Amino acid sequence: MCGSTLMREKEVVGCMRTMVFIGTSKSGSSREAIRAAERLGFYTVLFTRRKLNLEQRAEFSDVHELISIDLDDVPSMREKIKQLQKQGKIIEAIVSFVDGLVYTAAVLSEEFCHTDLSKEAILKMEDKIQTRSALQKTPFNMNYAIYKQGSLSFFIEENELTFPLIVKAPHSAGSKDVLKVDRKSEFESCVNKLKQKYPGSPILVEEYIDGPQYLVETLVYQNKVNIVAIIEQEISKEQRFIVTGYSLLTKVEEHLYESLSRAVISIIRMLGMKNGACHLELKFHKNQWKLIEANPRISGGAMNKMIEVAYGINLAEQIIKIAIGDAPS
């Protein structure tokens, strides 16, 4: 072993079919994806910035090679990938199941593996403002405005905003950066906090809408959208929006499924996803589906396990198949 690269002693016969993962959590969907890749016969390489992963190497037996690297330093990752190739590893895909890293992985995978993982669509989903722009003048958007700088009072008047409102940091996937405000003083406070936290970033301001909220997990292969699971979400209605419960719907009323699937397929096509996976969060408001958020990955946490228990589908494994150009089964 040398430097920060740790390799599990293992004899690999024939071509070393390799899959590179950019980032992971210790458990949950991103970790289960690595286990799925190992089951499929891949030599698994993990790029990580978490020192915890290196310190607890024995707990990552499904990771054959663990490389400590700055995941924001794309040139350094390129050099590491080239080194892996020089060692004889046949890299078939570079993937990530982690917020903010899916686009980087898709770009590197296209560059080194000639895969087609709809990187432009991923980029739109990782930026909430780009998502809204892609759905401009469609019924799936609620009223929204983009605050960059200047008087907040003038911004409210100019855009004819009425409370309550939702304030979002466009590049954050965390619920801590999605805030409900009921009055002008709260609005000014929340916007200023987000501007301090993300200097130079615009702020997305949306109309607050009521209605039941659903999370829809999808797989997209060669332009065909497959709805894998529909989950009704319980959302706290405090200032921060936190999911407090999931109800995976094993039986969905026909009219609900038909209207929801039409909306999901339309939205995914407008965003340009042709190959890959994404989950959408939608509300049904005044007889119309409204997109709350789109994310270019499977939900984290226990989602992969929930779907496997309910339907017998390992969604992370199916995503890996799409990443290497195979049809999901």
Give the role of each language-model region.
Residues 11-121, 325-328:
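ATP-binding N-terminal substructure of ATP-dependent carboxylate-amine bond-forming enzymes
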Residues 143-144, 164-193, 203, 210-217, ...:
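Glycine-rich phosphate-binding loop of ATP-grasp-fold ATP-dependent ligases
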Residues 207-273, 277, 284, 291, ...:
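ATP-dependent carboxylate/phosphate-activation module, predominantly the ATP-grasp catalytic core
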Residues 3, 20, 44, 153-157, ...:
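Peripheral (often C-terminal) accessory segments that flank ATP-dependent C-N-forming ligase machineries
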Residues 66-72, 145-149, 181:
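Short acidic-hydrophobic, aromatic-tinged amphipathic segments that line or gate anion-handling sites
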Residues 110-177:
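A conserved helix-loop-beta module that forms one wall/lid of the active-site cleft
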Residues 6, 15-18, 151:
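Residue-level detector of intrinsically disordered terminal segments
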